[in-house]
Amino acid sequence: MKIIIPIKRVLDPYTQARVNKQTEQVDLTNAKMAMNPFCEIAVEEALTLKESGAATETIAVSIGTDKTVDTLRTALAMGVDRAIFIKTESELDLQPLHVGKILANIIKREEAELIIMGKQAVDNDNNQTGQILSGLLDYSLGTFISQFDLSSDASSVEVSREIDSGIETRKLNLPAIVTVDLRLNEPRYASLPNIMKARSKPLETIELDSLG
């Protein structure tokens, strides 16, 4: 089973945001950036599945400018097998539908059976990309997941999430998209040896225009 983990580069949550008075937008000039915290949880869950023998390969995918490569390197250092970088001129022009269409293209190409992603990015809090992907690909969908169990034959996953009345549990047949919540796991830190190894792991760059 091949797993794709879409990840996003965001302003470090522990950094004080600055606002550009002219544009009235967050000023990211020289700002400290990091992987979206929900994406870190998605990476951890994918790695756990790989280590259990349930997954054959884990692939991190991110869309953005050249600086996005640093975030992909972080995923590789955590243990992801390879990465795909979709290069754009600007990150600000991409809306969730655009992101969904780009990711759908890559998922089809890779023939991934399971997509694990953060429930939302902490910068815009859109909470739309997973749902859009499910519609575009006609994949099963589970959102806000706090518990995840793969079946013994790897044909389905049982997922749970918190709702107002308690815990909701559903079975999703693969292929499936799962968006994860903070309660699912505790992401690992990348060790120094793994940070060094990440430099030699495959990282493919694709120009956005080439996807059509």
Task: Give the residues covered by each predicted segment.
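N-terminal glycine-rich FAD/FM-binding segment characteristic of electron-transfer flavoproteins
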Residues: 1-212
